[in-house]
Amino acid sequence: MAIKEKQVQDYGENPIEVRDSDHYQNEYIEGFVEKWDELINWHARSSSEGEFFIKTLKEHGAKRVLDAATGTGFHSIRLIEAGFDVASVDGSVEMLVKAFENATRKDQILRTVHSDWRQVTRHIQERFDAVICLGNSFTHLFSEEDRRKTLAEFYSVLKHDGILILDQRNYDLILDEGFKSKHTYYYCGDNVKAEPEYVDDGLARFRYEFPDQSVYHLNMFPLRKDYVRRLLHEVGFQDITTYGDFQETYHQDDPDFYIHVAKKD
């Protein structure tokens, strides 16, 4: 029987030069995906988020939701359990496989779609009340063209008055003052270190170290909050509310994460 060769992340000779929107395909290898739930810790993340996303979706009358960054299925499964009709999209096959396994263990069946964000409308012809893109996923896009294309795709699959919920790490704080995460939201795993290894205006390279000493990386683009709000507006979203760590009132530099709720008029 052939022994399956262990995958490794490949950033070439100079990792900080890898600034490509398509490179996420090489980052979410099986070993990293298997540890992803250890990083986010479903129970702790559920406690830290509370009912924020469920409450926001219900306030806007949403019933059908497209989870554009399914990952290992955390939000898709929570929303299904809360009664929403969910389609689960991800560009990583490995993530979708893990998400389906996680859902099965909770006696749920995910409706998964493998698709790059920039081509969502090629694979999905339905329209949704809401699109969610969570887990700092949008920062995998390194070019403005890719960001605009992705937001336009999200806009297209939304019904009139539909909403996009998109989050991002507080890169303003990291770029201007350095990294000082409270580690309270999103990445809640015990004894898992998640911190930037290198940062400039075009790259935030994060290092993830697990209790077994295994180390993985992600190269992401450090998006500033006001830039994202401007892009959302220019693509067509008009009513945009930004929350800091699930609070509408926050000090500019305090949150670890921003959550944008943008309405299609």
Swiss-Prot record:
Keywords for the protein's UniProt record, in alphabetical order: Methyltransferase, S-adenosyl-L-methionine, Transferase
SUPFAM superfamilies in the cross-refs: S-adenosyl-L-methionine-dependent methyltransferases (SSF53335)
Class in the EC hierarchy, top level: transferase
Taxonomic classification: Bacteria, Bacillati, Cyanobacteriota, Cyanophyceae, Oscillatoriophycideae
Gene3D superfamilies: Glycine N-methyltransferase, chain A, domain 1, Vaccinia Virus protein VP39
Organism whose genome encodes this protein: Aphanothece halophytica
Family: Belongs to the class I-like SAM-binding methyltransferase superfamily. Glycine N-methyltransferase family.
Positions contributing to substrate binding: 136, 169, 208
PROSITE patterns xrefs: SAM_GNMT
Record's catalysed reaction(s): glycine + 2 S-adenosyl-L-methionine = N,N-dimethylglycine + 2 S-adenosyl-L-homocysteine + 2 H(+); glycine + S-adenosyl-L-methionine = sarcosine + S-adenosyl-L-homocysteine + H(+); sarcosine + S-adenosyl-L-methionine = N,N-dimethylglycine + S-adenosyl-L-homocysteine + H(+)
pH dependence of function: Optimum pH is 8.8. The activities remain high at more alkaline pH but decrease sharply at the acidic side of the optimal pH.
Example GO biological process: regulation of gluconeogenesis
Pathway the protein acts in: Amine and polyamine biosynthesis; betaine biosynthesis via glycine pathway; betaine from glycine: step 1/3; Amine and polyamine biosynthesis; betaine biosynthesis via glycine pathway; betaine from glycine: step 2/3
GO cellular component: cytosol
EC number assigned by the record: 2.1.1.156
Regulation: Inhibited by acetate, dimethylglycine and S-adenosyl-L-homocysteine.
Its biological purpose: Catalyzes the methylation of glycine and sarcosine to sarcosine and dimethylglycine, respectively, with S-adenosylmethionine (AdoMet) acting as the methyl donor.
Protein's name according to its UniProt entry: Glycine/sarcosine N-methyltransferase
GO molecular function terms noted in the UniProt entry: glycine binding; glycine N-methyltransferase activity; identical protein binding; S-adenosyl-L-methionine binding; sarcosine N-methyltransferase activity
Quaternary assembly: Monomer.
Residue sites binding S-adenosyl-L-methionine per the record: 28, 36, 45, 69, 90, 116-117, 134
